[in-house]
Curated annotation (Swiss-Prot):
This is Large ribosomal subunit protein uL14. Part of the 50S ribosomal subunit. Forms a cluster with proteins L3 and L19. In the 70S ribosome, L14 and L19 interact and together make contacts with the 16S rRNA in bridges B5 and B8. PANTHER family: 50S/60S RIBOSOMAL PROTEIN L14/L23, LARGE RIBOSOMAL SUBUNIT PROTEIN UL14M. It comes from the Bacteria. The gene is rplN. Transmembrane segments: none annotated. Binds to 23S rRNA. Forms part of two intersubunit bridges in the 70S ribosome. It comes from Citrobacter koseri (strain ATCC BAA-895 / CDC 4225-83 / SGSC4696).
């Protein structure tokens, strides 16, 4: 569960290291985002010469959460931390060209097939 002010790791090579959620998109009073939800983020920590810089405000999709994802068979997939993939504000396609770490099968929608194809492991 991601809410405003939550710090997340970045699971791509866009140049950002840590980001902070500033808004959960989708509904006027929506509080929490889970895996597959789009959030508005600001870059808090970035590497030199990256594609993004500190202070940029962008969109991101949540790919891993500590809370986990419940599957219809009752199993729960949990991760050690919260992570996201940074998206282009207009096209909502990933800025980075590589994805680090596993992602869940819940991302397998038409919008995020690019992330699924770049990921090294889909759980």
């Amino acid at each position: 569960m991601i809410q405003e002010q939550t710090m997340l790791n970045v699971a791509d090579n866009s140049g950002a290291r840590r980001v902070m959620c500033i808004k959960v998109l989708g509904g006027s009073h929506r509080r929490y985002a889970g895996v597959g939800d789009i959030i508005k983020i600001t870059i808090k920590e970035a590497i030199p010469r990256g594609k993004v810089k500190k202070g940029d405000v962008l969109k991101a999709v949540v790919v891993r959460t500590k809370k986990g994802v419940r599957r219809p068979d009752g199993s729960v997939i949990r991760f050690d931390g919260n992570a996201c993939v940074i998206l282009n504000n207009n096209s909502e396609q990933p800025i980075g060209t590589r994805i680090f770490g596993p992602v869940t099968r819940e991302l397998r929608t038409e919008k995020f097939m690019k992330i699924i194809s770049l990921a090294p492991e889909v759980l």
